[in-house]
Amino acid sequence: MKKKLNTKKENNNFYILVNDLFLKIEDNLNLYENEIDIDYEIQDYVMTITFSNKTLIIINKQEPLQQIWLATMQNGYHFDYKNNQWICNRSNKNFWEIFENACSIQSNKDLIFCKK
């Protein structure tokens, strides 16, 4: 007999992980609010970050795939949650490394984010 997966529980855990990530992103962006012009908004689990040069970074959840997607000027990235971190499924880099680099490039400032 096949064991049914509890997708409701898995989805609840996914939402917790996504909420946690979005809160950490907000906290980190707010650290720089007096230093650089960054605006962001969140609507339906889509975060749009706008820099003073009008470039965008967009982060959203892909619930059916249980992934986070990140779109930057440089590329698009898909992240799976592995070993307590979001890992890019192509480069095996963690989310924060790619996100921090993209924000630094798009803001023309060296940004360092606290990941905890």
From Swiss-Prot:
Coiled coil: none
UniProt KW keywords: Iron, Metal-binding
InterPro entries the UniProt entry points to: CyaY, Frataxin/CyaY, Frataxin/CyaY_sf, Frataxin_CS
GO (cellular component) term, any one: cytosol
An example molecular function term from Gene Ontology annotations: ferrous iron binding
Top-level division of the source organism's lineage: Bacteria
Gene3D superfamilies according to UniProt: Frataxin/CyaY
GO biological process terms, semicolon-separated: iron-sulfur cluster assembly
Family, as annotated: Belongs to the frataxin family.
Entries under HAMAP family matching the protein: CyaY (MF_00142)
Protein task: Involved in iron-sulfur (Fe-S) cluster assembly. May act as a regulator of Fe-S biogenesis.
Record protein name field: Iron-sulfur cluster assembly protein CyaY
Organism: Buchnera aphidicola subsp. Acyrthosiphon pisum (strain APS)
Gene that encodes it: cyaY
